[in-house]
Amino acid sequence: MTLIVLAATMGNKYGGLKQLEGIGPNGETILDFSVFDAIRAGFNRIVFVISKHFDVEFKKLVSGKYEHLVDVRYVYQDIETLPIEKRNSKRTALYGSVRAVLMGREWIDGPFGVINAVNFYQKESFQLLHDHLQTLKDADFDAVNVCYRLANV
């Protein structure tokens, strides 16, 4: 089962590539926590949707971490991936999450999950997502959103 990881954001508000920033005691990134939790839940292919603008930096920090555990693929989300007749010459921002998921469609062969590389998801979320996706047979359209109850914690 495939997990699409939306990681093409440039981090303009953050001031850098938030998805590659070490936060754990051994330099783990939010992305590391997510990928390892997804693998533990049963996902066996990770497709990173990245930008060509930082692909060398991204692959330098990510490549080799997960390939021994799962199938890892990299696809690009850039303005240049749009057909020329659809491009807006004044636009510099990416075209959103749906467009990013479409970039990974070559590697989707059944039910799949989608996460943002810069968000933290608890490990239970990946298990809930994987377990639900496992129940899907031949659905043309089915969706699940793993949500959290907001409370004072």
Please annotate each region the language model reported.
Residues G64-Y66, D131:
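Short, hinge-like loop/turn segments at secondary-structure boundaries
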Residues M1, N44, H68-D71, D109-G110, ...:
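Short coil/turn connectors at secondary-structure junctions
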Residues M1-S63, V70-V72, Q77:
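N-terminal glycine-rich phosphate-binding loop and ensuing alpha1 helix
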Residues Q77-V153:
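Conserved beta-loop-beta/alpha segment of the NTase-like Rossmann-fold superfamily
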